[in-house]
């Protein structure tokens, strides 16, 4: 009997089921469970009409029961030394309220240390200030962000980057398969010169970031660091590009700013990447073998002329560069349909599927002429229309 019980426990753990995890389906239960700490499994979308701040003082591991679940109008404030992890959550703010400030994860200035911050398989959007903000000199040994899309941030205050760490003392920051899209204040900002950082980005895409209106003050750098000669910065297979203007794809000058430290940049595509005042250029591993000139873009594909002509595996899986095409996928753009604020309308009987920008299907109807999208939350989506005679088209749209 003891062996049988042990075997069952092993199966539960292998399957990802955590013992003593609290499963929640309402915002009230979610708030109580998260404040209590421990493993919190979210089984349903969390509907919440007003901005709600949740104070965190204990280790907490938040995850979706399956796939991804929505979390509306939630603001986390970390107020003691904890490990914070969030996985499989679509976090956004639908409320028009101006206060409190729309920051997904906020660390007040008086917090001495936060042991770790982990974000995985998430989508974050419509936080008008930041995705993550640290106001003081908080020690943060590790930050990890993986398989995540961050978009439409900083619209209320473009002086803030999506990740705004100011003087926080971060030792290691790792980003893998992440897309930053329309983050007006830039991507990552640190002004701490005292702590050497091991900073790594692999398969990360920056699209239309760091180009807030000239009238706004603040950093326009995509990535910004203060001087520290012992720091190490690695960018591998990354795509950094500019903005959309009248559906034209224009690379803008983007900056990676660090006055000292060692940069390793390999197989990454950008236009006019400026790395300022490297400590010892003779020993830097700084390779930029790729150059690009922009052509045009529509919302189905982005065509870029590159040198060399074919390059592989650059950027996140959500917006990546393969050959000379970057975008969602190459399709036969022959089916005719249009998108209004409330529906997708096809001229032929079709199968219509709506995807989140991460690629997750969120709506589908078969053998129809139209599909209502009125219930979708604000955000970026893709629509695929496939007719019965094999014609297929994909378009991107922004639900406002």
Where are these regions (language model features)?
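Bacterial Sec-dependent N-terminal signal peptides
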Residues: 1-23
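Disulfide-bonded cysteine-rich modules in secreted/extracellular proteins
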Residues: 24-26, 276, 328, 339
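N-terminal extracellular ligand-recognition/capping segment immediately after the signal peptide
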Residues: 25-31, 37-60, 66-75
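Extracellular beta-strand/beta-solenoid scaffold signature
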Residues: 51-52, 71-77, 93-111, 125-139, ...
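C-terminal outer-membrane/trafficking sorting elements
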Residues: 331-400
């Amino acid at each position: 009997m003891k062996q049988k019980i042990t075997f069952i426990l092993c199966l539960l753990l292998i399957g990802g089921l955590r013992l003593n995890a609290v499963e929640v389906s309402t915002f009230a239960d979610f708030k109580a469970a998260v404040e209590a700490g421990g493993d919190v499994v979210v089984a349903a979308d969390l509907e919440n009409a007003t901005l709600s701040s949740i104070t965190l003082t204990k280790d907490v591991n938040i995850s979706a029961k399956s796939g991804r679940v929505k979390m509306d109008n939630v603001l986390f404030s970390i107020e003691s030394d904890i490990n914070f992890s969030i996985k499989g959550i679509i976090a956004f703010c639908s409320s028009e309220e101006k206060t409190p400030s729309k920051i997904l994860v906020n660390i007040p200035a008086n917090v001495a240390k936060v042991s770790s911050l982990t974000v995985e398989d998430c989508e974050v959007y419509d936080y008008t200030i930041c995705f993550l903000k640290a106001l003081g000199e908080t020690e943060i040994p590790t930050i990890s962000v993986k398989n995540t899309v961050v978009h439409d941030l900083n619209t209320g205050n473009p002086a803030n980057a999506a990740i705004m760490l100011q003087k926080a003392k971060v030792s290691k920051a790792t980003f893998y398969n992440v897309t930053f899209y329309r983050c007006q204040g830039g991507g990552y900002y640190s002004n701490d010169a005292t702590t050497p950082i091991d900073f790594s980005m692999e398969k990360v895409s920056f699209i239309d970031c760091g180009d807030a209106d000239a009238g706004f003050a603040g950093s326009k750098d995509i990535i910004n660091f203060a001087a520290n000669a012992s720091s190490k910065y690695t960018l591998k297979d990354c795509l950094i590009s500019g903005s959309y203007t009248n559906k034209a794809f224009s690379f803008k000058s983007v900056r990676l700013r660090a006055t000292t430290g060692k940069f390793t940049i390999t197989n990454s595509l950008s236009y006019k990447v400026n790395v300022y005042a490297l400590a010892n250029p003779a020993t830097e591993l700084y390779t930029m073998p790729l150059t690009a000139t922009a052509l045009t873009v529509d919302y189905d594909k982005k065509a870029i002329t590159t040198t060399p002509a074919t390059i592989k595996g650059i950027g996140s899986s959500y917006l990546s560069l393969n050959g000379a095409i970057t975008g969602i996928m190459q399709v036969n753009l022959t089916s005719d349909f249009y998108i209004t604020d409330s529906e997708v309308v096809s001229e032929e009987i079709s199968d219509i599927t709506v995807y989140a920008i991460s690629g997750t299907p969120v709506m589908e109807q078969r053998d129809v002429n139209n599909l209502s999208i009125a219930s979708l939350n604000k955000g970026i989506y893709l629509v695929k229309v496939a007719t019965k005679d094999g014609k297929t088209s994909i378009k991107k749209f922004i639900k406002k």
